[in-house]
Amino acid sequence: MATRSRAEQLAEQAFGDFTPPSAEKLHRMMAPMRAWFSPQFYGLERLDLSRPALFVGNHALFSIDAGLILDHLYTQYGVLPRSLGDHLHFQIPGWGQAVTDYGGVEGTPENCSELMRRGESILVFPGGAREVNRRKSD
């Protein structure tokens, strides 16, 4: 039997018995970010969040925006989108597990298709790592 990669193990976990963390836990975890930054969300009240949605964004520096977006959607609307993450996230010991625990999956076309097939809301930043690490002049 072939040995599965850590990313494959995490994907199996994410699609197996994924149980979302409590909204309160995510909200507490993001408290330092909310204290430092003041994110503003516009137009979400016009969405029918009883149906799956695809949230697409551009990353801010160091990718802190993803957690703030998840926190807001989950605590205010009860929606925890599943994030499509760069492959690197799932190679970092401990971090890959944390991303998976909060609904993240490796950003592959197959995983995106599976989330859509399951009727999940999805959060994706198409610019990925390239966008997170861009210089001010880019």
Specify the residue positions occupied by each region the protein language model found.
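Membrane-anchoring hydrophobic helices of lipid-metabolizing enzymes
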Residues: 1-72, 77-110
